[in-house]
Amino acid sequence: MVDHSTCRCARTVARLVPVIAGLLFLSAVRPVVAQESARDIVDRVDRLMRGNSSRGTVRMDIVTEHWSRAMEMRIWSLGTEYALIRVTAPQKDAGTATLKAGNDIWNYLPRVDRTIKLPPSLMSAAWMGSHFTNDDLVKESRIIDDYDIEIGFEGAREGIEVWEFELTPKPEAAVVWGRIVEQVRKRDLMPLWARYYDDRGELARSLRFEDFKTMGGRLVPTRMVVEPADKPGESTVITYADLEFDVPLDVSFFSLRRLQREAGSD
């Protein structure tokens, strides 16, 4: 019999992420030129968040109406298509892992020694019990292709020069959000926040990027906070403890065999 608490932990993943994998990758910033379009700028921001390869250690704190929990994880990523996320603490969840390869996601549940490929029906399920979904992990890498992008605001907000981008889905795009608004700091292309709206135009969740620090020789937002609009007081906070960039990884690292390794063996 499958331990449902373990399944919930494993089933339940922009920027990272949304979000988690995305923040592992940052590269050098060059100045923005005036003729760049909104799409060009968002594409550059996306590339800053998704370099060649990286690995890091993160802590995820989840607060819901009925419970709260903290988890520690190791993360490896290669480009936009590959990511491996392994829980290292608490001990009861250690070894639980998620592998992304292209559009496919597998979860490994060490308690029952079982690997599960997520079916389409579970793509909207919460990842690791958080306020992120499995679909976030797959779809975030295609934001430039799936959305039309315009600059909704350009100027100073609270003394900081920013862009605010309006993203609306293309007619043929199979996406969850009816609209996304993103704020980006001009001077270094650091994302400040994103707001996600449903197809009725109502705010569904918000994402904040905070605590900008230098890690691995690069400026990164080391803390992400996602809050669901319909659940006041609930949140998922992801905090980066360390990051390394341009590490030696190739596609063979992101295998089902690697997914099933014990925590601490990588």
Regions picked out by a protein language model, each given a short descriptive name:
Residues M1-V13:
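N-terminal secretory signal peptides that target proteins for export/translocation
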Residues R30-A34:
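Sec/Tat signal peptide C-region and signal peptidase I cleavage site
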Residues E36-R111:
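N-terminal mature ectodomain segment of secretory-pathway/periplasmic proteins
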Residues D40-D43, A70-E72, Y147-F153, L207-E210, ...:
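Short structured motifs
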Residues D61, W76-T80, T88-P90, N103-D104, ...:
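Solvent-exposed coil/turn segments that connect beta secondary-structure elements
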Residues L109-K139:
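Acidic/charged, solvent-exposed loop-and-adjacent secondary-structure segments enriched in E/D, K/R, S/T
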Residues R114-K117, D135-E140, E158-L256:
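Gly/Pro-enriched, hydrophobic low-complexity segments
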